[in-house]
Amino acid sequence: RDWLLLIGGSTYKFTLTGFYLVALVAILKNHGYSLNQLSWIHLIGGIEAAKVLFAALMERRPAGRFGRFRGWLLAATLGLSAVFGLMACTDITQNFPLLLACCVLLSAMSAVYGCAMLGLSCIVLPHRERGFGGVIQTMAARGGKMIGGALVLWLYQEYGQTAAAGFMLAFSLLMLLQLLCYREPDSPTAQGSWTALAARLVSFWWRPETGWRWLVLLFAVAA
């Protein structure tokens, strides 16, 4: 059940990415949106950069009745389901302010979902299995981007905007059902202040097995 949730959750996360960055932009372009308007969509997508803050908040929040990360996953999936439900019932392409509001929610909830799923994978997978877990997540990322980008666009081309949004809604509800049936294992609450967290982040790159050269490599790959 743990592996099933990690595979499904990782696929869903990158399906959201493919939908937002590929399908949604292509659909809006087809509706006559200008490059200036589309730039706002990508700018709002920068909310994902706040993941570091979301992750720190999740680590320090005591586990509640839904678990440390499962509660965040449930809340994010509910929010995403509401947005996709609105998209399926309303033509938001004709209302730019409403579209921007939906994009803010999509980006924010997607960031929360991604952080919570990564945190859950860290407490579910033993240290020796995290390498294999990374491979699974990479494969799920490839598949998710194809689903969110290519498949959703095909549905839009063949059956219209309602069908494309309806597919994303159905996928969200399926993940919500999976989360409702899942029970998160116990995990300790992270200790230390925000200052200690910043110190750990800096010291991590001074370790022999990491080092600043790997940080430079990461930035080079990202660029």
Model-predicted regions and their roles:
Residues 1-48, 212-223:
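Helix-loop boundary and gating motifs at the non-cytosolic
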Residues 73-93:
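C-terminal ends and interior cores of transmembrane alpha-helices
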Residues 56-62, 87-88, 146-164:
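Transmembrane alpha-helix termini and helix-breaking/packing motifs in multi-pass membrane transporters
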Residues 186-223:
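Juxtamembrane intracellular "pre-TM" segments in multi-pass secondary transporters
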Residues 47-51, 131-156:
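Glycine-rich segments within core transmembrane alpha-helices of 12-TM secondary carriers
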Residues 106-141:
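Cytoplasmic helix-loop-helix junction between adjacent transmembrane helices
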Residues 75-82, 162-181:
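Symmetry-related core transmembrane helices of the 12-TM Major Facilitator Superfamily/SLC fold
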Residues 11, 83-86, 94-113:
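Hydrophobic core of transmembrane alpha-helices in multi-pass small-molecule transporters
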